[in-house]
């Protein structure tokens, strides 16, 4: 592709607070490319009422190099693409669409790779025999898939809707060809956490609009590692409690940064500077 200029976008609902545009624009500029990253918010007048297919077609005809896809379109976009990576196809969700010079679209999931890279970076020697993930919705499917394809032997996914947790488990087990994921009821999850090596919060609990924790943190001990996908605030109540109890922790910034790093590489073919993108993210 032509690296003199880069045109990217994010399709989703209520995306005004996303830090992804700033990371891509700053990294592109640092690499010598005039980079524009547009928010395509389907709740705004400009995009409201337009189908996902129409938005993809418009991006192609306008000369976009790529798109990030977020809630609620990560699943809906799959059948609209020319090709999808094996990983994204197995997961059934795409968050990154590369648009070739010929207009062909290819879908990828950098939520999966981003979480894995963040985990390797932040907790490189964490024990992964048994892990509990709290939350089966939203980004939970990508986190669960990432965990069991990057070292976790047995994953228990807990949700207030046990059927949703089991559906996620069944889908991932089918995709990876082994019984590694088990759905459980989030009520009483503390017993499962107490017996596990680590726990990941994949619920909105801990966000500014949802203060608190998704489970009783008194079940944690110093042998646990604790991860959180929430990054606003970076220091969630869960991570505060976990550190006070002697646990090693992984905050949500790592996944957020590395999903953007991996997407930038796919969009441009350029090698991004992780620390530079991290600095941009943390400056916002």
From Swiss-Prot:
Output the Gene Ontology terms for molecular function.
NAD+ binding; NADP binding; quinate 3-dehydrogenase (NAD+) activity; shikimate 3-dehydrogenase (NAD+) activity; shikimate 3-dehydrogenase (NADP+) activity
One GO biological process term? aromatic amino acid family biosynthetic process
What positions does the entry give for NAD(+) binding? 137-138, 159, 164, 203-206, 214, 229, 252
Gene3D superfamilies, sorted: Leucine Dehydrogenase, chain A, domain 1, NAD(P)-binding Rossmann-like Domain
Q: What class of enzyme is it?
A: oxidoreductase
Q: What is its EC number?
A: 1.1.1.-, 1.1.1.24
Please indicate which superkingdom the organism of origin belongs to.
Bacteria
> What is the active site of this protein?
73 (proton acceptor)
Q: What pathway annotation does it carry?
A: Metabolic intermediate biosynthesis; chorismate biosynthesis; chorismate from D-erythrose 4-phosphate and phosphoenolpyruvate: step 4/7; Aromatic compound metabolism; 3,4-dihydroxybenzoate biosynthesis; 3-dehydroquinate from D-quinate (NAD(+) route)
The UniProt keyword set, sorted, is:
Amino-acid biosynthesis, Aromatic amino acid biosynthesis, NAD, Oxidoreductase
Among Pfam families, the record links this protein to: Sacchrp_dh_NADP, SDH_C, Shikimate_dh_N
Which positions in this protein are listed as binding L-quinate?
18-20, 70, 74, 95, 111, 259
Provide the catalytic activity annotation. Answer: L-quinate + NAD(+) = 3-dehydroquinate + NADH + H(+); shikimate + NAD(+) = 3-dehydroshikimate + NADH + H(+)
Residues that hold shikimate according to the record: 18, 70, 74, 95, 111, 259
Spell out the InterPro entries in the cross-references.
Aminoacid_DH-like_N_sf, NAD(P)-bd_dom_sf, Sacchrp_dh_NADP-bd, SDH_C, Shikimate_DH-bd_N, Shikimate_DH_fam
**Quick one: a GO cellular component term?**
cytosol
Question: What does it do?
Answer: Involved in the biosynthesis of the chorismate, which leads to the biosynthesis of aromatic amino acids, and plays a key role in the quinate degradation pathway. Catalyzes the NAD(+)-dependent oxidation of both quinate and shikimate to 3-dehydroquinate and 3-dehydroshikimate, respectively. It can only use NAD.
Similarity section: Belongs to the shikimate dehydrogenase family.
- Subunit composition? Homodimer.
Q: Which NCBIfam families match?
A: PRK00258.3-3, PRK12549.1, PRK14027.1
Q: What is this protein called?
A: Quinate/shikimate dehydrogenase (NAD(+))
């Amino acid at each position: 592709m032509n690296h003199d200029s880069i045109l990217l976008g994010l399709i989703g609902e209520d995306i005004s607070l996303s830090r992804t545009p700033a990371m891509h624009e700053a990294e592109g500029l640092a690499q010598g490319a005039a980079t524009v990253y547009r928010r395509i918010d389907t709740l705004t007048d400009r995009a409201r009422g337009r189908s996902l297919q129409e938005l993809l077609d418009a991006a192609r005809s306008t000369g976009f190099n790529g798109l990030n896809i977020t809630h609620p379109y990560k699943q809906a976009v799959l059948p609209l693409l020319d090709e999808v990576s094996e990983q994204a196809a197995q997961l059934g969700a795409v968050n990154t669409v590369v648009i070739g010079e010929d207009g062909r679209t290819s879908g990828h999931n950098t939520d999966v790779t981003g979480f894995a890279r963040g985990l390797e970076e932040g907790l490189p020697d964490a024990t992964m025999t048994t892990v509990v993930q709290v939350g089966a919705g939203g980004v939970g499917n990508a986190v669960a898939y990432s965990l069991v394809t990057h070292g976790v032997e047995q994953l228990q996914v807990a949700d207030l809707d046990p059927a949703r947790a089991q559906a996620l488990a069944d889908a991932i087990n089918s995709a990876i060809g082994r019984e590694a994921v088990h759905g459980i009821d989030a009520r009483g999850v503390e017993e499962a956490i107490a017996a596990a090596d680590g726990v990941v919060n994949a619920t909105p609990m801990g966000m500014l609009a949802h203060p608190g924790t998704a489970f009783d943190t008194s079940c944690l001990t110093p042998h646990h590692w604790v991860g959180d996908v929430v990054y606003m605030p970076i220091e969630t109540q869960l991570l505060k409690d976990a550190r006070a109890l002697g646990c090693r922790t992984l905050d949500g910034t790592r996944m957020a940064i590395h999903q953007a790093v991996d997407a930038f590489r796919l969009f441009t073919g350029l090698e991004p500077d992780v620390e530079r993108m991290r600095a941009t993210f943390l400056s916002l």
